[in-house]
């Protein structure tokens, strides 16, 4: 298990250059990404996990990675933004594709696992938080687009991206 401390995430300020961003502003959030497979972390205003060799027989609701976040002073709410847009109501954060069988797509969603209240995959990801409190999130596999009942083991490629915004 590889553990990497990720520097503070850069957050979009106000509405400058962002449509419908509301009053979300820059706040530093300490994020610790616990990577359970062979991945390369890359930070670009988001936590982006790029699979290198994910050899697996995927199981529903299996965790791909977890994110631990400590809330700094002055932050009372956090919003998780998936890859597609700032206004999406679902929290799909990406898709992995079997490199030998492109019909086998694994859809991943973010899930809040700890802290005050929980939300499950697909629910809106804006929630209240407490200062100096740690929260844990996980990327979970919730199904794919393969028409048959199972997925074959193999190498899956793609990327999962999630941004954390604070008020």
Swiss-Prot record:
Signal sequence, start to end? 1-21
Record key words, sorted: Fimbrium, Signal
Please classify the protein's predominant subcellular localization into one broad category: other
Q: Does the keyword Acetylation apply?
A: no
Q: Name one GO cellular component term.
A: pilus
Q: Where in the cell is it found?
A: Fimbrium
Q: Which InterPro entries match?
A: CssA/B, Fimbrial_Assembly_Comp
Entry-linked Pfam families: CssAB
Q: What is this protein called?
A: CS6 fimbrial subunit B
**Which organism does this record belong to?**
Escherichia coli
């Amino acid at each position: 298990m590889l553990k990497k401390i990720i520097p503070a995430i850069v957050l979009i300020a106000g509405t400058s250059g962002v449509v419908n961003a509301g009053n979300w502003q820059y706040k530093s959030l300490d994020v610790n990404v616990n990577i359970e497979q062979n991945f390369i972390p890359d930070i670009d205003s988001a936590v982006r996990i790029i699979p290198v060799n994910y050899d697996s027989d995927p199981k529903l609701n299996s965790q791909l990675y977890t994110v631990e976040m400590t809330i700094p002073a002055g932050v009372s709410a956090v919003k998780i933004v998936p890859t597609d847009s700032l206004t999406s109501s679902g929290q799909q954060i990406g898709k992995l594709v079997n490199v030998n069988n492109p019909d086998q797509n694994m859809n991943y969603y973010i899930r809040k696992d700890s802290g005050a209240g929980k939300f499950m995959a697909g629910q809106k990801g804006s929630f209240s938080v407490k200062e100096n409190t740690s929260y844990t999130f996980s990327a979970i596999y919730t199904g794919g687009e393969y028409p048959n009942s199972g997925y074959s083991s193999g190498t899956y490629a793609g990327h999962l991206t999630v941004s954390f915004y604070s008020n």
